[in-house]
Design a protein with these regions (language model features):
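N-terminal amphipathic/basic leader segments beginning at the initiator methionine
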Residues: 1-41
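Short helix/loop capping segments that flank catalytic or ligand/cofactor-binding pockets
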Residues: 15, 24-26, 75-76, 165-166, ...
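Glycine-rich phosphate/diphosphate-binding loops that line cofactor/substrate pockets in enzymes
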Residues: 49-65, 92-95
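Short glycine-rich or small-residue beta-strand-to-loop segments that form or flank ligand, phosphate
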Residues: 63-74, 99-105
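Histidine-anchored nucleotide/phosphate-binding helix
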Residues: 74-93
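An acidic, phosphate/nucleotide-engaging active-site surface
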Residues: 110-178
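A short, gly/pro- and small-residue-rich
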Residues: 173-193
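Conserved small/polar residues in nucleotide/adenosyl-binding loops
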Residues: 203-208
Length: 210
């Protein structure tokens, strides 16, 4: 018998395979990460793809909303937010005009002791922070999607002159991939919007075309 140990949550489980049935295992090729994470983020901000630099988009007097992931995601937001604030400062945006929104979607609000871990002490001192409340009645209607979803989003986010989405792109057990546009829906959207959008999972292709 061959014992094959498989990661399972925070532990491992053993699969015992008869030797005659075991052909071998294919291991992923290990890739080392960057050694200077902040430097890479600063480089990305100075060399954006398909758009102008953030400090050319934002200007003095603008209200800026930065959406970051909540405590249920292992996104290194603390590495991203500080360089973003520096880039906005170079554009003339004052710290008091920046709001960091924890994109909680339908999750609970971020606890005070979690905020520093998520975005870092420096960012907490410089910018305002709020947790999105999907049950709040103070949301702004933006319109309908092609699937008929009424889109209501966080008022602070909607009224910001400049909106910055942060996060990671990763595999998702329902949607295939998660990240990117999820920083708007569901992250800063209303209960009605989230529920209707998630229900689209059950649509057939015919229903989606109607």
């Amino acid at each position: 018998m061959v014992d094959v140990w498989l990661p399972y949550g925070k532990t491992e489980v053993c699969a015992r395979i008869p030797t005659r049935n075991f052909l071998g295992s294919i291991e992923p090729k290990e890739r080392l990460g960057v050694t200077d994470s902040r430097g890479e983020i600063e480089r990305a901000l100075s060399e954006p793809m398909g758009t102008r630099r953030l400090n050319e988009i934002a200007k003095e007097g603008d209200k800026v909303a930065i959406v970051v992931d909540d405590a249920t995601r292992a996104t290194p937001s603390d590495l991203m937010v500080s360089p973003l604030l520096d880039e906005l400062n170079r554009a003339g945006v004052k710290d008091e005009d920046v709001t960091i929104i924890f994109g909680c979607g339908s999750h609970r609000a971020v606890k005070p002791d979690e905020m520093e871990k998520l975005v870092g002490e420096e960012a907490l001192k410089k910018a305002k922070t709020i947790s999105h409340d999907y049950k709040s009645g103070d949301q702004v209607f933006l319109g309908k999607t092609s699937f008929g979803t009424k889109v209501y989003v966080n008022k602070v986010f909607a009224e910001a002159n400049v909106k910055v989405l942060t996060g990671d792109i990763g595999l998702h057990y329902y949607a295939g991939y998660g990240g990117g546009r999820k920083s708007v829906l569901p992250a800063v959207s209303s209960a009605e919007t989230i529920q209707h959008n998630h229900a689209c999972l059950l649509y057939t292709s015919d229903a989606a075309d109607e």
